[in-house]
Regions:
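N-terminal glycine/serine-rich phosphate-binding loop of ATP-dependent small-molecule kinases
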Residues: 1-50, 78, 105, 154, ...
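Short, well-ordered alpha-helical scaffold segments within catalytic/effector domains
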Residues: 5, 9, 61, 192-196
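Generic structural signal for well-ordered alpha-helical scaffold segments
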Residues: 9-17, 97, 119, 199
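Short beta-strand scaffold segments in enzyme catalytic cores
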Residues: 36-41, 139, 196-199
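Hydrophobic or amphipathic alpha-helical targeting/insertion segments
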Residues: 45-48, 66-75
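Short alpha-helix plus adjacent loop in nuclease-associated cores
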Residues: 53-70
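Gly/Ser/Thr-rich active-site cleft segment
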Residues: 58, 76-194
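Short, charged, surface-exposed secondary-structure boundary motifs
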Residues: 62-66, 140-142, 199
Length: 199
């Protein structure tokens, strides 16, 4: 996960320097990311508690197979619009909570998609938030109510307390820490990679 943060900082600097952009002219920045990849970290220290578990990871396949044909599968389909598949974040979260010793006590842990992990580390105040295009690919987000689905969370034994707050994509996500570009810059938009490709 820390490699992702290094890459973000380097990319921002490269974009500014290669294009001779005056940092004082930057009014706002946005963020885009691959959506289903997750990271667990300690809320207080920001230390990662797991490697990034990629959208390509299939470790949740046995769990997914175990709930096919159950009420839980039907709830996930109806509430999220997604099928039960290890591609989506919920299976990775379930697998990690059951298999990674660092997560067993569930104290001070949080989890999020990559946008959430990046924000927690580059924004003043270290917020634990995500936005709808990322949340909607977890298999935990009710797309009708635009909230985490409590019934699904209960069925999967995922505490809502470890999940980020969900906000709109065009939200004031906070201010980029001054130590990254030498200037505090607001982050006012986040979109998943496929949605952002439209722009």
């Amino acid at each position: 996960p820390k490699e992702v943060l290094i890459s973000v900082g380097e990319t921002l600097l490269e974009a500014v320097n290669k294009n001779n952009i005056n940092k004082e002219c930057i009014l706002s920045i946005g963020l885009t990311n691959q959506r289903e990849t997750i990271v667990f970290w300690n809320k207080k220290t920001l230390e990662p508690l797991s490697p990034a578990i990629s959208w390509q990871c299939l470790r949740g396949i046995d769990f997914c197979n175990s709930i096919v044909g159950t009420k839980l599968e039907a709830m996930i389909n109806k509430s999220t619009g997604l099928k039960v598949d290890p591609y989506f974040s919920f299976s990775k979260i379930v697998w990690a909570l059951r298999n990674l010793k660092a997560l067993f006590d569930k104290k001070d842990i949080c989890v999020g998609t990559i946008d959430s992990w990046i924000l927690a580390n580059i924004v003043d105040g270290n917020p634990h938030i995500t936005e709808i295009t990322n949340a909607s690919r977890t298999g935990l987000f009710n797309t009708k109510t635009e909230t985490w689905d409590i019934e699904i969370l209960d069925g999967l034994e995922i505490p809502i307390s470890i999940l980020p707050k969900v906000v709109k994509s065009n939200h004031n996500f906070g201010v980029l820490s001054v130590n990254i570009l030498g200037k505090k810059i607001p982050i006012n938009s986040i979109l998943g990679d496929q949605q952002s490709s439209l722009y």
